[in-house]
């Protein structure tokens, strides 16, 4: 216990983990003032109720910060441009953690607190993501991680503690799903989901229709991109938040964007998670199609080789790093001409290409045609093939006892 800590800023969500933080912090840091910081990431919760809950739990102040637009522009759009997927599957919804940490620091400095606290467990990735960002942004602040300090060892014990302190939580011992929700995705973990051999229960999905219940008619959508960033849906220019919300609704009802995966956590263990990300799935598909039209072969291949590096960086929470800045600089150059329109059909969990166009398209029918043309001289290929395959020919001659004649 640090006796000199008199004021603490807490990253507060109102869920189980952070619901019990306020009384615990006040108990273990005598006379400490707790300030709750709530970020509106589009989680579609009653944030006023969460604010009141924080105050009723003993917080002296509670801030609600609307970061949805900032989240989309400064975090999600760079992610779309990168095309990064962690382990080729995970859509990286926890990219929100550095932004939460940033807002926590801003309020902490304004309020002149001694310490900041978060509700991430000692078994998960979020503790690393939060604390990496906090140390990068405000290394002078003390960091408190109650899950690594208290005697509570399970979610069931946390529920008991909450009830003992009169704190209402949206979780019961029989259905202890741990959910994280923002405008990019919803994640589901815990309970029966911890066993990968068990099929996902029907009560898990919140934003996406089961494929069996999806419409029997396909839906055509049109996405416009400018320099790798989505700017319009169905020929209507929308704000980033409105575009994401609309696309989540459209793609979600068609059963698109559900991932049931086992991922490797940064802290060493494997975890099963169910992720819903309808808009993200569609945007990634459309962006990838447009890149195939607009990027040169060598640029596309180099970018693809760096996507896992970028995904790892985001997954590990290294958003405020020199590496991330360098990768963003490269990606921004690749996106200068990723501008155009992509048409897609949404149908029972499938995203089907239905045409694309770009003023910067590098695809020229006159060159690619299988019909007779006067542009491409096929005889030119012979010299290229001879030079391209020369090393293979020499290797074969040397190791098979051949000669150079």
From Swiss-Prot:
InterPro entries cross-referenced by the UniProt entry: Arginosuc_syn_C (IPR048268), Arginosuc_syn_N (IPR048267), Arginosuc_synth (IPR001518), Arginosuc_synth_CS (IPR018223), Arginosuc_synth_type_1_subfam (IPR023434), AS_cat/multimer_dom_body (IPR024074), Rossmann-like_a/b/a_fold (IPR014729)
Entry's EC annotation: 6.3.4.5
The superkingdom listed in its UniProt entry is Bacteria
Single GO cellular component term: cytoplasm
The UniProt keyword set, sorted, is:
Amino-acid biosynthesis, Arginine biosynthesis, ATP-binding, Cytoplasm, Ligase, Nucleotide-binding
Any coiled-coil regions, as ranges = none
Report the pathway entry.
Answer: Amino-acid biosynthesis; L-arginine biosynthesis; L-arginine from L-ornithine and carbamoyl phosphate: step 2/3
Entry's localization field: Cytoplasm
Fill in the subunit field for this protein: Homotetramer.
In Swiss-Prot or TrEMBL terms, this protein is called Argininosuccinate synthase
């Amino acid at each position: 216990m640090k006796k000199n800590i008199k004021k603490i800023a807490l990253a507060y969500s109102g869920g189980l983990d952070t619901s019990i933080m306020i009384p615990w912090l006040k108990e273990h840091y005598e006379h400490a003032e707790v300030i709750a910081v709530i970020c509106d990431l589009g989680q579609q919760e009653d944030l006023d109720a969460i604010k009141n809950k924080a105050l009723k739990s003993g917080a002296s102040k509670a801030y609600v910060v609307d970061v949805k637009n900032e989240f989309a522009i400064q975090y999600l759009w760079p992610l779309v441009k990168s095309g990064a997927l962690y382990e080729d599957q995970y859509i990286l919804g926890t990219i929100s953690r550095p932004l939460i940490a940033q807002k926590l620091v801003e309020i902490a400095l304004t309020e002149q607190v001694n310490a900041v606290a978060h509700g991430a467990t000692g078994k998960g990735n979020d503790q690393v993501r939060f604390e990496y960002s906090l140390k990068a942004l405000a290394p002078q602040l003390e960091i408190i991680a109650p899950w690594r300090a208290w005697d509570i060892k399970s979610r069931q014990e946390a529920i008991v503690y909450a009830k003992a302190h009169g704190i209402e939580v949206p979780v019961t011992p029989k259905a202890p799903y741990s959910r994280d929700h923002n405008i990019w995705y919803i994640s589901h973990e815990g309970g029966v989901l911890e066993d990968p051999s068990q099929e996902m229960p029907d009560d898990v999905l919140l934003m996406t229709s089961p494929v069996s219940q999806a419409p029997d008619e396909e839906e055509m959508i049109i996405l416009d991109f400018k320099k790798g960033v989505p700017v319009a849906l169905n020929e209507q220019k929308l704000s980033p938040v409105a575009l994401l919300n609309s696309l989540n609704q459209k793609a979600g009802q068609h059963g698109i964007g559900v991932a049931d995966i086992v991922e490797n956590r940064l802290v060493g263990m494997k975890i099963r998670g169910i992720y819903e990300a309808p808009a993200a799935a569609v945007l990634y598909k459309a962006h990838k199609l447009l890149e195939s039209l607009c990027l040169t072969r060598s640029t596309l291949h180099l970018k693809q080789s760096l996507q896992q590096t970028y995904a790892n960086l985001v997954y590990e929470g290294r958003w405020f790093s020199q590496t991330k800045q360098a990768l963003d600089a490269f990606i921004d150059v690749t996106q200068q001409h990723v501008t155009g329109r992509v048409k897609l059909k949404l149908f029972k969990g499938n995203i089907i290409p239905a045409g694309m166009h770009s003023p910067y398209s590098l695809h020229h029918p006159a060159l690619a045609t299988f019909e007779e043309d006067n542009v491409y001289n096929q005889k030119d290929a012979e010299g290229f093939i001879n030079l391209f395959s020369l090393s293979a020919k020499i290797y074969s001659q040397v190791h098979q006892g051949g000669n150079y004649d």
